[in-house]
Structures are given as C-alpha cells and as structure tokens.
C-alpha cells in the first residue's frame, strides 16, 4: 500500500511539474481551470510560461496559485468524488427501489455468469446488512466496497 502511495505521489509530482513551467513550486489556478475545461471539451490544453510564473516570487501568500500539496489535495478530492459516483452507478445496477435485495443480487450475479441460490444471496447480504433489514442500502454498499 505504501508503494502505491509513493507511486501516486510521484505521478502527482510529474503532472504538477508539467504545469509548473517556471519551476517556482506554484501553479496558477487559472492554468489548471483552463486545462480542465480543455479536457472536458476535448480540446488540447496549452500552458504558457506566463501562466505559471508568479509575478512576485517573494510573495508567499498568493492565493491565486497552488503549491504541490494543494494540488495533491485537489486531485485526491476529485478522485473521491469519482469513486462516490462510480459506487452510485454500481449500486444502481443491483438495486431495486429500496436497495439491493437477495432477489436483485441473485439476478445480477446470474447476468454476470455467477449463479447463486437465493439462500446464498441472503447469506451474502447478511454479512454487510448493518441495520439487519435484509436489504443493502447505499451506505451499507459503500462500506462493503471499501
């Protein structure tokens, strides 16, 4: 796990360095916003030298730029939001109106080529059914997937 975190950290540093053309350890927020907008629209993002240069390098309270630690937090918050969205999409595949029931789990597993009996599905659900209502709600599903 630690190795994975080191690799992620190295990757974040590499991406940050691509934005930080002036090598001042800061990236302007407007540069990041332009790049994100370009990615969303399918265009190629252009990072100018001027975008990444702090006009006054002595000034350490520039709230219009991000240092590496801020950049990492921003990326990781985005990753968490993506994980939550992915979990919701996965949950929708299994759920009936009230949540994942043994019947809906059996149906989905069957579609995935993993046939289980209704009793097997009841046992699987009981392992993560925190409130013991026989149904997996989204919060229980999230806990199960972590």
Swiss-Prot record:
Disulfide bonds: none
UniProt keyword Protein transport present: no
Record's function text: Potential calcium sensor.
Keyword hit for Ion transport: no
PROSITE patterns on file: EF_HAND_1, EF_HAND_2
Source organism (scientific name): Arabidopsis thaliana (Mouse-ear cress)
Renumbered residue ranges of the record's region Disordered: 44-65
Residues holding Ca(2+): 129, 131, 133, 140
InterPro entries recorded: EF-hand-dom_pair, EF_Hand_1_Ca_BS, EF_hand_dom, EF_hand_pair_protein_CML-like
Domain (EF-hand): residue spans on this chain: 7-42, 116-146
Gene Ontology molecular function terms on file: calcium ion binding
Induction: By touch and during darkness conditions.
Matches recorded under Gene3D superfamilies: EF-hand
Protein name per Swiss-Prot or TrEMBL: Probable calcium-binding protein CML40
UniProtKB keywords: Calcium, Metal-binding, Repeat
